[in-house]
């Protein structure tokens, strides 16, 4: 199963001459792959040489055993290619993405939990999105003003804090964890409740 959310990313990375949109990458993965890891590898192997023509996108990819988050951007208005990263959601944890890139530090040596194209850091450098100093953080490099300098908005914060309140997460933090371990089992009804939440009675109340 594959879910999708758009984070757009810097417009200077978008080249509509790229062959693949996110829908086409998803279609190819669903047709040809029976697990999340192979789906990620296939999408990367198609988008890198033939080009990715969309804005920044995030896919949540689930198979019978694992769930991964895959984030992808173009590499420049006049360049054909793609830069992407994927992170595995740990067993017994939950993750959420709502129009904001969520993956932070890329631990390339941890192949059980991370995958990425070889060019991610260089694309960020080439486009003035990272100065090459310090730890490279994917979401910081490829974010937009919508996120206001963070890797979350009210939706990510509300859900993560709801299921793991003892972590003491606050909206004032600059960064929230990629995933959290819920303090009680989460079922389908819990997910449905979160998706229809209007945050009534909170600072994010949508009913006012």
Task: Label each PLM-derived region with a short phrase.
Residues 62-65, 72-76, 87-92:
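Short acidic-glycine loop/turn motifs at beta-strand connectors
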Residues 56, 92-97:
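Acidic/polar low-complexity flexible segments
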Residues 42, 46-68:
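Gly/Pro-rich turn-and-neighbor structural signature
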Residues 1-4, 68-69, 95-96:
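Short hydrophobic-aromatic micro-motifs
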Residues 40, 64-67, 79-82, 96-208:
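C-terminus-biased signal that marks the final domain/tail of proteins
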Residues 6-8, 74:
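A mature extracytoplasmic/lumenal domain signature
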Residues 20-24, 54-56, 79-81:
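Short, solvent-exposed loop/turn segments at the edges of secondary structure
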Residues 8-51, 100-124:
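Compact, glycine/acidic-enriched structural inserts
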